[in-house]
Amino acid sequence: AALYHAAALRSCYGRAAAHEVELSDYADPSQTFGAMPIVVECGDELQLPPVPASAGLFADRRQAATEHLAGVEIFKQKDYVYRLSTMKRFTDATQITILTKMRRSGGCKLTKQEWKAVRDTDISAASATEQRRRLAGTELWYQAAPTWATVSMAQVIRPRLSAVKAAATLFIVPAKDYILNRPQNPRLTDAYLTEVISSIPNMNNTGRLPSIGLVHLGMIIRLTNTVEAPEAVTDSTGEVVGIDLDPDEPSAATEHTSAIEGIRILHMQPIITVKLHGVRTEFLPPVSCTLHAATSACRDCTSCDFRAGCIAVEAQLSRRSFPVEVQDPGSDTWYTIQVQRRQLPMTIKAASTINTLQGVTTDPGLIFHWKFPRFFSSELRWLATYVALSRPPSLAQLISVGVPDELRSIIEAGPPEGILSRFDDMFKEKEEATHIRAAEVMRELGWDATD
């Protein structure tokens, strides 16, 4: 909510000089976002809250800061609120019915066939032969989970499968971790400390930098930190189109760093060129064709490459250190060391946390691990379930691992009351008025409301 307030205010700063906007009126209904004549916002209230949840627009406001409260009030100033009811992503009638029942206030029972369709996505109890059959052809599928322990595993599995599919060399890039307060203990060897530090799965605890980077030409990646605002920002996606090794990197011909063919472990951190999705900005110098090599790249030449949307991604140093608990292997003594990490700020797009999965259509498919963290409330379990079941276009494109016994009751219970009531408190009256007004406009235009 505080971020929403900041966005509304900064939009006024940007438009004040050109449009004579009065900054002090930025929170008035007609003046928000710099008096933009039309502001359209799209979203789904049935999504996981931000981290921390207290920052969300639907969070408890009793002890919220002034900026938070201002953001909520600006958010509530919508003229029209319309809830879309037709899901265009899906091709599976059973899946649509299940999701419709999930959204029904008060809950709704699944039929035996509907529950069987969910259970049949689970491969946990299948034989090894059947699991291999079901997993065949899923090299480019998404793999996601609510826990970082599983996601960190997927961040290794998906690049290897993607590299095999692309017939490309997979480069392994270990992070450079710097210990700022190393204890004077000979048993805490470099190898031991490296293993302990690299075993931390949650990238939120490591400056959003992975302990091991894996990359190959053609891999679809997600940036884990901002590289170049406002376009190459956190969670931007793109394709790896270039891998420039450090000049001091040992030659692959003289140093065999991996016994597995097609994998190369790097000693130095490379520079990765990524072509960002949906971006046309020219961040890098153009590459001239042979004809224009002596002069400069020509805009009219189809062979000259201006590398639109391409950006060079270098290793970043985490902005602050992070704590790591280390046990003395020879005693019960524990140390808290502070570590700062340098690493490429990227990971494969297909390995995803449940939060990052929101808003994504997981095409060609999704492998989902149904293990909820113990701290997940009933509300978070329902939201995570809804997100997982609503990402793939069909249940045939969902492979489940470890469907819990409680999943059916989660689905049938319907959305937790708090989610619905918080949204209705803000927008129920406006939503009803919007439907009435929409019907009137359609009649005025002569449109058929049944289309």
Language-model-derived ranges and their functions:
Residues 1-451:
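Conserved ATP-binding/catalytic motifs of P-loop helicase motor domains
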